[in-house]
Amino acid sequence: MACLSPSQLQKFQEDGFLVLEGFLSADECEAMQRRIDEIVAKMDVPLHCRTEFSTQEEEQLRAQGSTDYFLSSGDKIRFFFEKGVFDKQGNFLVPPEKSINKIGHALHALDPIFRCVTHSHKVQALARSLGLQMPVVVQSMYIFKQPHFGGEVAPHQDASFLYTEPLGRVLGLWIALEDAMLENGCLWFIPGSHTGGVSRRMVRTPAGSVPGTSFLGSEPIRDNSLFVPTPVLRGALVLIHGEVVHKSEQNLSDRSRQAYTFHLMEAAGTIWSPDNWLQPTPELPFPPLYT
């Protein structure tokens, strides 16, 4: 079981994040990595959908490329790519398996290996110890952080993209499938930054618009001295409050930094914003965590 102790719960409430080392075994990590290798080996992405992923605001809006490919990925398993991996015709400049930034956004629902991890007894026990009554899974991602050029993730709050009313209802679970160290792009947090609300939001634009999203508000300039690095070993789980500010640096090392991450929402008494880029569909309503 993975229940939090009172001291762990207090630390999460104070800092907005919490590291749980050894949450998954090496065998559990290897099973997900083997499965993702199989998924990548069968990758078939049309030229017009080869969408580079970025969290820099202007680049992000440009990089969506195929608006529908991104906006309709919530109930599918789709591929998003690093910058600079395609030529002007959309052909790969690097081996395809080294080109991927992430795979999202419904591994938790559509793949049995990832569904099993997401709904495991350990995850359910963790959610219960956090007091979640009706948690649902809203999205999932497999993040590669490729060696030598795995892109940085700029400072952000997850609730900017997954907005709810009231706030404080979104929780990220980030699982290291490889050691995540300073050299290969571990997570960095500003402890206690989850108490000041959300500075900006990414919202859908009217149907047919290109790009399909825009930003309301702006990300303030953050004091870099406030960020604390959070290196973790393979198998660790990092709990991430939806409003805590976090980032990761570019991976310039020769080691990847693979991770599986998914987001929960407390559905009881919560409104999922209809302006969010991600929306439940008739084919895939947000599945309850508790089974």
Swiss-Prot record:
<feature type="binding site">
    <location>
        <position position="102"/>
    </location>
    <ligand>
        <name>2-oxoglutarate</name>
    </ligand>
</feature>
<keyword id="KW-0597">Phosphoprotein</keyword>
<dbReference type="Pfam" id="PF05721">
    <property type="entry name" value="PhyH"/>
</dbReference>
<dbReference type="GO" id="GO:0051213">
    <property type="term" value="F:dioxygenase activity"/>
</dbReference>
<feature type="binding site">
    <location>
        <begin position="156"/>
        <end position="158"/>
    </location>
    <ligand>
        <name>2-oxoglutarate</name>
    </ligand>
</feature>
<dbReference type="InterPro" id="IPR008775">
    <property type="entry name" value="Phytyl_CoA_dOase-like"/>
</dbReference>
<keyword id="KW-0223">Dioxygenase</keyword>
<feature type="modified residue" description="Phosphothreonine">
    <location>
        <position position="55"/>
    </location>
</feature>
<feature type="binding site">
    <location>
        <position position="156"/>
    </location>
    <ligand>
        <name>Fe cation</name>
    </ligand>
</feature>
<feature type="binding site">
    <location>
        <position position="248"/>
    </location>
    <ligand>
        <name>2-oxoglutarate</name>
    </ligand>
</feature>
<dbReference type="GO" id="GO:0046872">
    <property type="term" value="F:metal ion binding"/>
</dbReference>
<feature type="binding site">
    <location>
        <position position="246"/>
    </location>
    <ligand>
        <name>Fe cation</name>
    </ligand>
</feature>
<protein>
    <recommendedName>
        <fullName>Phytanoyl-CoA dioxygenase domain-containing protein 1</fullName>
        <ecNumber>1.14.11.-</ecNumber>
    </recommendedName>
</protein>
<feature type="binding site">
    <location>
        <position position="158"/>
    </location>
    <ligand>
        <name>Fe cation</name>
    </ligand>
</feature>
<keyword id="KW-0560">Oxidoreductase</keyword>
<comment type="function">
    <text>2-oxoglutarate(2OG)-dependent dioxygenase that catalyzes the conversion of 2-oxoglutarate to succinate and CO(2) in an iron-dependent manner. However, does not couple 2OG turnover to the hydroxylation of acyl-coenzyme A derivatives, implying that it is not directly involved in phytanoyl coenzyme-A metabolism. Does not show detectable activity towards fatty acid CoA thioesters.</text>
</comment>
<keyword id="KW-0479">Metal-binding</keyword>
<feature type="binding site">
    <location>
        <position position="257"/>
    </location>
    <ligand>
        <name>2-oxoglutarate</name>
    </ligand>
</feature>
<comment type="similarity">
    <text>Belongs to the PhyH family. PHYHD1 subfamily.</text>
</comment>
<keyword id="KW-0408">Iron</keyword>
<feature type="binding site">
    <location>
        <position position="141"/>
    </location>
    <ligand>
        <name>2-oxoglutarate</name>
    </ligand>
</feature>
<feature type="binding site">
    <location>
        <position position="174"/>
    </location>
    <ligand>
        <name>2-oxoglutarate</name>
    </ligand>
</feature>
